[in-house]
Every structure is written in structure tokens, then in C-alpha cells.
Curated annotation (Swiss-Prot):
Keyword Cytoplasm recorded: no
Organism name: Mus musculus
Claim: Membrane is one of the keywords in the record: yes
Protein location: Nucleus; Endomembrane system
Protein name (database record): Acidic fibroblast growth factor intracellular-binding protein
Alphabetical keyword list: Acetylation, Membrane, Nucleus
GO molecular function, one term: fibroblast growth factor binding
InterPro entries: FIBP
Length: 357
């Protein structure tokens, strides 16, 4: 009597998400085993500590072999050694390039060089993130920067194409690349209240409106470099505060429009000229690299802190900035409306994001 037996052979690579997270977080095999034991996995599965140790080591070996492919994610999709379902490939890539908020705040705006890498020991101690994880995150930032810094086209699209990241994560990396390239200061004490999300929001606005790519999508380094011609032209805005008649008329237009609508009207009326000088002088100084780097320091010093000290609610800040920007269009002696809109459209969005405790 003969019997038929169907045999299926599979070699799908198994990915344990919890172990992958421990590996990404920089834990050693022994530390990972201890954490898995603490989670109650032995009771749940009936396994022994020896089996758990072996399982963890197997996963770590797999992740180590996958890491070189994760450095160039399209290679992971096209390799034939590991049979990994597409959904798992996406998870591996996305989590490998995910970063800690506390870590990115320490390196945002710094040069992605060996000098900064030497500081990772201190950053690890300060943030409580393992040194191994800090190195992975820093190397990811540097790798993405090196690949896309010279490319034409949309920064976000280039990152997505070469690293297969989700739209949100690609936008975050675009902000990191943009800040590293322009070396914006983010570490000063008065900026510590700002989150990475605050800076990333502003980066996206600046990329959309202040870069070379905002006016010409065929320009090299389209979304990475600020438009130098635009920054030079911003000096023309100085007339708004240098010309006393224009300054007085601007103030009159804003006060007339906001009387009875602003809870802090008297404070606004008293400080209008100082606030306007602050915002216009920030623009006029952006021809110098140092002043570009200090943009966020200046915005907090010249606008956020004065308004905060007078207890402006966010709703009043929004009303003021809207009217302050729009009223310029009624100044007959002013000839740089398009330049003003390009500057203030972005600045208004940034200031509203920066204005919080």
C-alpha cells in the first residue's frame, strides 16, 4: 500500500518585533534575555532560559546580517538570501531609521562629522539612550545626508526613493538634513523648550518657500540650500522700519484694524515699533551665515519672549501677525510686496509654532 505525502519547505525569515526593538535599542544579548525574562515570556511559552538565550542569539545574528542591507533599503527588497514578506521589510526599514526625540534634539543643526560623533558618549549619558543606539541614529542621519545632499529635486521625495521611508519619517529626515546643511543653532538654553517637531515644522515651511527649489525645481541642491538671492533681497524690507512715515503708517493701519479685537491691544500699541524692528531686522541680517544660524535665537529673543512677558495669548499673536503682514499691502510707498509675502508667510507660521511655554 502506498501513501502520498505533500511536503512544503519554507525558509521565511522570522522577525520577532520585541527582540528587534531590543537590538535597535542597543542592548547586549544577555541584557535582552534578562528583559525578555522580566516580561514574563518564560511563563507564557513554557520555554527554558537556555532556549530563550539561543532564540535571542539567533535573532541578533539575523539582524546583524540584515544591517548592511538596511543601510541601502532597496537592496533589502531585491536580495534573495532572506525570505521576508513585504510588510516585514517595511517594518524593518522604518524602525531601523526611527530615532529618539531626546537624541535628535542634541544633534539637530550640528555638523554630521567625526567631531560631533565624539560627543555621543556624553549624549548617551545625558539622554539615557545606549551608546550603540546613539551611534546607529547618528550614522543614519549622516548616511541620509550624504546620499541626498547633492541631489536635484524634492528632498522628501529623494529620501523616500533611496531609503523607502514613510512620508512622515522622510519629512523628519528632510528637516534633519536641512538643519545640518544650514547649521541652525538649536542648543542654546532659551531654545530648550522647543521640540524637534517645532523645528521640523519650521524646516518644512522654509524648504517650501525659502530655498532655491521654491522658485526653480531644476536647481541643484533644490531643497537643501537657502535661496541666497532671496536672502540678499530681504535687505530691501529695512525701509519698513527705517522710514519713519512708513513705520508710523504701518502701526496706524494695524492698530485701527485690531482696536477692540485684541486683549493685549495697549501692550501691542506700545511695543509695535520694537516688534516690527525685530522682525524686519531679522530679515535684513540673513545675508550673513552667522545670522542665518542664529535665526531661531533671534525669533525667540525679538518676538516670542517680549510677547510672552506681556502675556499675549496665542490667539492674539495669531491676529496680530495676520494683520501685521496684510497691512503692508496698503502702504503706498512700499514696493516689495512679493518679497514681503515670501518672508512673512513662512515667518508667521514659524512664530505661531514657536509661541508656547
Amino acid at each position: 500500500m502506498t501513501s502520498e505525502l505533500d511536503i512544503f519547505v519554507g525558509n521565511t525569515t522570522l522577525i520577532d518585533e520585541d527582540v528587534y526593538r531590543l537590538w535597535l535599542d542597543g542592548y547586549s544579548v544577555n541584557d535582552a534575555v534578562a528583559l525578555r525574562v522580566r516580561s514574563g515570556i518564560l511563563e507564557q511559552t513554557g520555554a527554558t532560559t537556555g532556549v530563550l538565550q539561543s532564540d535571542t542569539m539567533d535573532h541578533y545574528r539575523t539582524f546583524h546580517m540584515l544591517e548592511r542591507l538596511l543601510h541601502a533599503p532597496p537592496k533589502l527588497l531585491h536580495q534573495l538570501i532572506f525570505q521576508i514578506p513585504p510588510s516585514r521589510q517595511t517594518l524593518l526599514i522604518e524602525r531601523y531609521y526611527t530615532f529618539d526625540e531626546a537624541f535628535v534634539r542634541e544633534v539637530l543643526g550640528k555638523k554630521l562629522s567625526k567631531g560631533t560623533k565624539k560627543d555621543l558618549d556624553d549624549i548617551s549619558t545625558k539622554t539615557g539612550i545606549t551608546l550603540k543606539s546613539c551611534r546607529r541614529q547618528f550614522d543614519n542621519f549622516k548616511r541620509v545626508f550624504k546620499v541626498v545632499e547633492e541631489m536635484r529635486g524634492s528632498l522628501v521625495d529623494n529620501i523616500q526613493q533611496h531609503f523607502l521611508l514613510s512620508d512622515r519619517l522622510a519629512r523628519d529626515y528632510a528637516a534633519i538634513v536641512f538643519f545640518a546643511n544650514n547649521r541652525f543653532e538649536t542648543g542654546k538654553k532659551k531654545l530648550q523648550y522647543l521640540s524637534f517637531g517645532d523645528f521640523a515644522f519650521c524646516a518644512e515651511l522654509m524648504i517650501q518657500n525659502w530655498t532655491l527649489g521654491a522658485v526653480d525645481s531644476q536647481v541643484d541642491d533644490m531643497d537643501v540650500d537657502l535661496d541666497k538671492e532671496f536672502l540678499q533681497d530681504l535687505k530691501e524690507l529695512k525701509v519698513l522700519v527705517a522710514d519713519k512715515d512708513l513705520l508710523d503708517l504701518h502701526k496706524s493701519l494695524v492698530c485701527t484694524a485690531l482696536r477692540g479685537k485684541l486683549g493685549v491691544f495697549s501692550e501691542m500699541e506700545t511695543n509695535f515699533k520694537n516688534l516690527s524692528r525685530g522682525l524686519v531686522n531679522v530679515a535684513a541680517k540673513l545675508t550673513h551665515n552667522k545670522d542665518v544660524r542664529d535665526l531661531f535665537v533671534d525669533l525667540v529673543e525679538k518676538f516670542v519672549e517680549p510677547c510672552r512677558s506681556d502675556h499675549w495669548p496665542l490667539s492674539d499673536v495669531r491676529l496680530f501677525l495676520s494683520q501685521y503682514s496684510a497691512s503692508v499691502h496698503s502702504l503706498d510707498g512700499f514696493r516689495h510686496q512679493a518679497l514681503w509675502d515670501r518672508y512673512m508667510g513662512t515667518l508667521r507660521g514659524c512664530l505661531l509654532r514657536l509661541y508656547h511655554d
